[in-house]
A protein has these predicted regions:
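Strongly charged, low-complexity linkers/loops
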Residues: 220, 230-238
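Ferredoxin-type iron-sulfur electron-transfer modules and their immediate structural context
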Residues: 2-218, 222-224, 253, 257-260, ...
């Protein structure tokens, strides 16, 4: 009986000693936490999406307080919360237009296939099988890796088979951009409505042969733009959003409907008629000027 009592006493004493050692160690080696971290954390989205590049919202809050991340590092939190975090950190509120994701492909059912893929319905998996089923090496595969990555319900596969973004739901967290194996998703200003929905850098004939909606780098959009807001770069049209005013002239001259929102056939014909009338008027004016000059020379 005494052996049992001694064993209990020894274990109790050891437990007390170890507990005391741990208590002292916790005080000595305690890592002081900045109280601002909790305040910053309360203004983050709480989705732990990882779009900021840090391990969860707590990691993002710690990075902001440490000065390793900007106060607007959490895109889903929005401008209002970014301003609140800036106030906590004693900084000026960040300014800048809201950004949303945009998928640079509108090929879908109009993109030619090399073979019928019947494997795992995932874009990353599909690209590992002979580089994917599409003839176009730049096209959206349409299996929804980006849709699965989005925690805000902003991504879906559109009627034509390509991924599309709901700008009202998009927080520009970047999860879809990371998930896309072809890097087709980019950030664009939310207020801008005209976008080039193609990333194909192949030359005209090659691009034309793989998709009915591909940009062929013809440069008609570049020539038509009055604001110098669109240029062909590496074989594909690129919009300068700082210059673009959304006039949509580029959509009316694009022969491939690669610029969204695509103009209807009626709008294109109407615009062609206007351009023809302008050309005829200019030609008539030039002819009249030449005749007048010839008459005065006699």
């Amino acid at each position: 009986m005494m052996n049992v009592i001694y064993a209990i006493l020894v274990l109790g004493i050891l437990g007390a000693v170890f507990g005391l050692v741990l208590a002292v160690a916790s005080k000595i080696f305690e890592v002081k936490k900045d109280p601002r971290e909790e305040a910053v954390l309360s203004h983050l989205a709480g989705a732990n999406c990882g779009g900021c590049g840090f391990p969860g919202c707590a990691g993002c809050a710690a990075a902001i307080v440490a000065g390793d991340a900007p106060v607007n590092a959490c895109a889903p939190a929005g401008a209002e919360n970014a301003a609140a975090i800036a106030e906590i950190m004693g900084q000026a509120a960040p300014t800048g237009e809201r950004q949303v994701a945009f998928v640079r492909c509108n090929g879908g059912v109009n993109a030619k296939k090399r073979f019928e893929y019947r494997g795992v319905q995932d874009c990353i998996s599909a690209t590992k099988v002979a580089a994917g089923p599409l003839d176009c090496a730049f096209g959206c595969l349409g299996f929804g890796s980006c849709v699965n990555a989005c925690q805000f319900g902003a991504m879906s596969i559109g009627p034509n088979g390509s991924a599309v973004v709901d700008p009202d739901k998009c927080t520009n967290c970047g999860a879809c951009m990371t998930a896309c194996p072809r890097h087709l998703i980019t950030s664009v200003p939310a207020s801008k409505k005209v976008h080039v929905a193609c990333a194909n850098q192949d030359k005209g004939k090659a691009a034309m042969s793989v998709c009915a909606n591909s940009c062929i780098g013809c440069g008609l959009c570049q020539k038509e733009c009055k604001k110098d807001a669109i240029h062909v770069v590496n074989g594909v049209a690129v919009i300068d959003y700082e210059k673009c005013v959304g006039c949509k002239l580029c959509t009316k001259v694009c022969p491939r409907d690669a610029i969204l929102p695509a103009a209807t056939a009626e709008e294109k014909e109407k615009y062609k008629a206007i351009k023809k009338a302008q050309a005829e008027k200019a030609a008539a004016a030039k002819k009249a000027a030449e005749e007048a000059a010839a008459a005065s020379a006699q």
